[in-house]
Amino acid sequence: MNKTYFLGSNTAYGFFGDFSHLTRGKTVILKGGAGTGKSTLMKKVNEIALDAGFMTETYRCSSDVSSFDAVFVPSKNFAVIDGTSPHVTEAEIPLVSGFVFNLLDAADEKKIAPYKDDINYAVSCKKQYFNDAYCNLNCANLIFENNKRKLSAAFNKAVASAAKDTFAALELSHGLRETRFVAALSDEGFVDFLSNDFKGLYTIGVRAEYPEIIMLYITKLLSLLAANDVEYTAFRSPFSPDFFDAVKVGNVVIADIDRLQKCDEIITLDAPVSLTLRTDLDAAENLHRTFVDKAIANIRLARLTHIGIEKIYSPAMDWTDVNNKTDKILCLLFDC
């Protein structure tokens, strides 16, 4: 069994990571830039762990959804993480709980040397594409936050009442409160693994005319859960990571109805909205979508540039050395 998350997301504040829980146990940190085989190594670790009967969590790259940024085996408290920018990670206690493997150790520098200027230029372009994406996402987020403030006044009572009703109906237990990214803004647009990961659980779909209303409801519900020391996993908004747009409490998942493949229960959040406010919100939504589309285009350009860098590094790699490192990492997992 596997669950899929993101290590972070491209947000209004730049890249925002959420993976501190992966470094609590035995942690393998991979170093090496583009084209060095980090993702392929993690896919192999994940495949072998699954074949051995372990449940795994895989963490995708928000700029390339097909690529792995981390793999975690919860029952072994064992993680392999891509420790390079923008999610730089270091070993807290080297060779005890943290193990660093640099996949570039045996690379042939002579094969890379002729392309140094090309690499520097490509890296500079890639950074600019991401900066442009974050600028557009910041503009989109300002619109979203302004809409949320406007809707808060109209929906505050309905949201508070619905959150209290949901809280009262849940089976609660005390424990850890954790956060994850289960959706992200990527080179493919908005990618969401929520429905894939929680099949078989009781699902509550929240229906509202505007997504801001659902976020207000989730915020109210999380406040009640936290005040009562209830265990939950909250899922960060891929655009505005200080806020949350879905939550799992025990065996119940609560999210926007459009994100769920099936719903066992539906909550409708409704309140009167004036024609003037509706007109303002619709115009703002169109502008918000324009900024998000521009951000996705920038992320896609950054990804294409990254592919170009990969093509330079990959032929210089010593893949026998990478395979040997993979075997050592598997020994750390299986205590051999």
Placement of each model-derived feature along the sequence:
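N-terminal pre-Walker A segment at the start of P-loop NTPase domains
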Residues: 1-19, 157-196
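Glycine-rich phosphate-binding P-loop
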Residues: 27-46, 188, 199-225
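SAM-dependent transferase fold signal centered on methyltransferase-like domains
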Residues: 195-196, 318, 334-336
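A cross-family "folded-core" feature that marks the main globular domain of proteins
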Residues: 30-31, 41, 57-60, 139, ...
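Generic N-terminal leader/targeting and pre-domain segments
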Residues: 1-53
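An accessory alpha-helical subdomain
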Residues: 118-171, 287-330
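Conserved nucleotide-sensing/catalytic segment adjacent to the nucleotide-binding pocket
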Residues: 1-12, 47-111, 117-118, 223-297
